[in-house]
Regions:
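Ubiquitin-like/PB1-type beta-grasp interaction modules and other compact soluble beta-rich domains
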Residues: 1-92
């Protein structure tokens, strides 16, 4: 299946892209992140909690313009044509 990934902020800086399409065999968010980490290892530090072996809790995931609120975001199923974005927490003042 083919998934579109949208990159913003630090993600865009690291990848040098605002979007890309990735062929995916495993149909979960964790499967997608694994594929992304193989291509852009630096992204792993931004969104992966090595100690707990899961996505960091402060990372927001948007699939097809809908914010995912499930506790275990990594297990979310993806289907062909999904559009996915990972968002870092907003800072301001």
């Amino acid at each position: 299946m083919k998934i579109e990934i949208l990159y913003f902020a630090d993600f865009k800086d690291i990848t040098g892209k605002s979007r890309e399409f990735i062929e995916l065999k495993e149909n979960t968010v964790e499967g997608l992140t694994s594929k992304i980490f193989n291509k852009y290892n630096t992204l792993k530090n931004l969104i992966w909690d090595d100690e707990n072996k899961k996505l960091k809790g402060n990372i927001s995931i948007v699939i097809n313009d809908k914010l995912i609120k499930e506790k275990n975001k990594g297990k979310m199923k993806l289907i062909d044509g999904d559009k996915v974005a990972f968002l870092l927490p907003f800072a301001g003042g």
